[in-house]
Structure formats: C-alpha cells, structure tokens
Amino acid sequence: MKTFKRTLVLLVVCMLPVCMSARTEKETPAYRQKGYAGSVAMTDWLFVFGGLETSHGYMFNEHHYLGGGLGAHFCPIFFPDMIGVFEPFIEYKAYFLKRGSTPTASLRAGYCVASFFHPELDEGTVVYAEGISPFLCPAIGWDWGLKRGRGLSLNVGVQIMTNQMELLLAPKLSFGFCF
C-alpha cells in the first residue's frame, strides 16, 4: 500500500508541470501565440470617415505584436471632391495580460494619402493623390479571446498628423476581428 501511495504522489508531482503548461495555453488565445497574426477592423475616423483597416504581422510572444497594414477611409457626401484617405502603416501592439481578455496599447506610424476628384484638369474626371502626410496613432483598447483561436478588439486612439506646417489631431475608434 505504501508503494502505491508513493507511486501516486510521484505521478502527480511529475504531471503537475504538464498540467500547468496546458492550462496556460488555454488562457492565452491561439491568435496571440508566437507566429503569424492578423486583424481586420471597422474604423470611424474623426467621427466622419468610416472605413476598414487590416494589419498582418508577427507575434513574438503572447504580449508583443509587430506588423504592417493598410487602412481605407471613405468620405461622406459633404466632401464632394474627396474620394477617401488611404493609410499604409506599421504597428506595434502590446497585450498586458496572458488571459483571453486583456487591455492593450498600440502605436501606428505611416502616411495618410488623400485622393481627390478634379474634373477641370483634363477631359473627363481625373483622380490623383494629394495631401500625403506622416502620422502617428497611439491607442488603448481591450481584446477578447474567442473560441477556435479568434478574437475581438475595441480600440480608441488619436491620429496625429502633420500637413503643410499644421499639426492635426483626429479621434479614432475601431472594432476588429483578430486571427
């Protein structure tokens, strides 16, 4: 009987690290494991321009993401000459907790490219890019892990741009799907 108890205790002690590591993997969603990660988000920029953004990159561990992407924000009808704003960017995102639900902070850097219609330049309508300006966009938010290695994110930030010697600040809200 003593041998059985000792064997059982030894087995439990040996299996404890395996059980603890399995539990940790369940707490961290699959989209935050080391390797490729991506997201697609609906955004509201300046509370006027609606759009989509996508970011693809590499998760170094469950806390650090580095990637790049493209945003496209479309103009409402009361900006008749403007088509939209396109933003190529690079992004760093920090996840503070190992849990599936965690606060986040991110920083994006890139260029805003505004596209306009100008019918008076040639015959027909001419589309060209104007107003290329660098930007930084710090944001805070929250990520929720879902089943099957997916997640949702909600972020609030401010886009800081420079355009012809002016500093422009624009609030930004995004709701995204992470994979």
Each model region followed by its residue ranges:
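Short alpha-helical segments used as structural interaction elements across diverse proteins
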Residues: 2-3, 20, 90, 105, ...
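Short glycine/proline- and aromatic-enriched beta-strand/turn motifs that initiate or cap beta-hairpins
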Residues: 22-60, 64-70, 178
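Gram-negative (and chloroplast) outer-membrane scaffold detector with strong preference
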Residues: 42, 55-152, 156
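A generic beta-sheet turn/junction motif
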Residues: 47, 96-100, 179
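Extracellular/luminal ectodomains and secreted, surface-exposed scaffolds of diverse proteins
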Residues: 158-160, 172
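Short, exposed beta-strand-loop hairpins at the edges of beta-sheets
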Residues: 161-165
